[in-house]
A protein has these predicted regions:
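Residue-level preference for beta-strand/loop junctions
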Residues: 2, 47, 62, 93, ...
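Hydrophobic/aromatic beta-strand elements that line small-molecule binding cavities or substrate pockets
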Residues: 6-8, 65-72, 95-105
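Structural signal for hydrophobic/aromatic residues that build the beta-strand cores
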Residues: 17, 51, 70, 81, ...
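Glycine-rich portal/gate segments that line the openings of hydrophobic small-molecule binding cavities
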Residues: 25-29, 38-90
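Beta-strand/loop substructures that line and gate deep hydrophobic ligand-binding cavities in soluble
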Residues: 80-138
């Protein structure tokens, strides 16, 4: 299985970033250009739940929506999804993403937000999901600006 990852430093505690990521109402307002809506369509965010992400106009030429099944949750730290429907599922099978929020050492008011994907291209010519990584990191960077407004 291939892997790709990236990370950004956020100027907020990991717990706050975690709460923002897990709350559909908040996450849908952080950066509508990249993510216009998130809904748990089955479950409440625990393993086995299904979450639908509707992507915004900034990435809709690449991915319009993604249906994800939550596989693992480490409360306050990370969530791992397997993409089970949408555009990414057609390009990669499997496609598994982990978002994690880890406090920085020596400063509890900052955290490292990491995006990691494990994937197999569905066709030999399918490129790595660099656009997905770049969009995810831009979205995570938006957390800092959003937290100032709510």
């Amino acid at each position: 299985m291939k892997m790709m990852k990236g990370q950004v430093v956020l100027n907020m505690p990991a717990e706050k970033a975690w709460e923002m990521y897990r709350n559909n109402e908040i996450i849908s307002k952080i950066n509508p250009e990249l993510l216009s809506r998130a809904d748990y369509i089955q479950g409440d965010g625990a393993p086995g739940s299904l979450r639908l992400f509707k992507l915004g106009p900034g990435v809709s030429n690449y991915v319009k929506e993604s249906m994800e099944k939550i596989e693992k949750v480490v409360s306050g730290r990370s969530v791992t999804y397997e993409v089970i429907g949408g555009d990414l599922k057609e390009m990669y099978d499997p496609y598994r993403v982990t978002f994690s929020f880890v406090p920085t050492q020596g400063n509890s008011n900052k955290c490292i937000a990491e995006w990691k994907a494990e994937f197999e291209p569905s066709a030999p010519a399918t490129p790595p999901p660099e656009q997905a990584r770049d969009a995810a990191l831009r979205f995570l960077e938006s957390f800092d600006n959003f937290q100032l407004s709510y």
